[in-house]
């Protein structure tokens, strides 16, 4: 006789949807139980968890975080399809990075700088080569013109609750 609530969880891959939905109510093996899911370490099929509180009964559907699978109507997520459509129209596609293009003159050099990034380098290019650099979290600069830093000293103003800021602070230890 408790009211029934359907909850659908959507989000990007590895952003904690399964953990958030039930605090680990199901073991990983129960959620990602298809061979392909285990091999790739991703959720392809929707996972379902039911639980109750003193006031309500919940049926929670965790949708896969991969755009290739979310829209597939055969996954049994029709109960949240309208929500997905509404979210898709409101939230743009996540950024994939920026592709930098341009002309490097003969003998010009450039550096890609970023924090903790794996950078693959191209030793040389020839006239007529079409080159582009995917620079997500990186900057392309003239060699030696800037240096990356891991520590900075800054003065920070934190918005109060009344100004729209957080009312509980977070730091690296909490």
Swiss-Prot record:
Residues at which GTP binds: 62-66
This enzyme's EC code(s): 3.6.5.3
Subcellular location as annotated: Mitochondrion
Residues annotated with N6-succinyllysine modification: 78
Phosphoserine modifications at: 121
One Gene Ontology MF term: GTP binding
Residues with PTM N6-acetyllysine: 161
Enzyme superclass (EC): hydrolase
Catalysed reactions listed for this entry: GTP + H2O = GDP + phosphate + H(+)
Entry's transmembrane regions: none
GO BP terms in the entry: mitochondrial translational elongation
Chief place where the protein resides: mitochondrion
GO cellular component: mitochondrion
SUPFAM superfamilies assigned to the protein according to its UniProt record, in alphabetical order: P-loop containing nucleoside triphosphate hydrolases (SSF52540), Translation proteins (SSF50447)
Modified residues (Phosphothreonine): 103
Alphabetical keyword list: Acetylation, Elongation factor, GTP-binding, Hydrolase, Magnesium, Metal-binding, Mitochondrion, Nucleotide-binding, Phosphoprotein, Protein biosynthesis
Annotated InterPro entries: EF-Tu_GTPase (IPR050055), G_TR_CS (IPR031157), P-loop_NTPase (IPR027417), T_Tr_GTP-bd_dom (IPR000795), Transl_B-barrel_sf (IPR009000)
Top-level taxon: Eukaryota
Described purpose of this protein according to its UniProt entry: GTP hydrolase that promotes the GTP-dependent binding of aminoacyl-tRNA to the A-site of ribosomes during protein biosynthesis.
Protein name: Elongation factor Tu, mitochondrial
Organism: Mesocricetus auratus
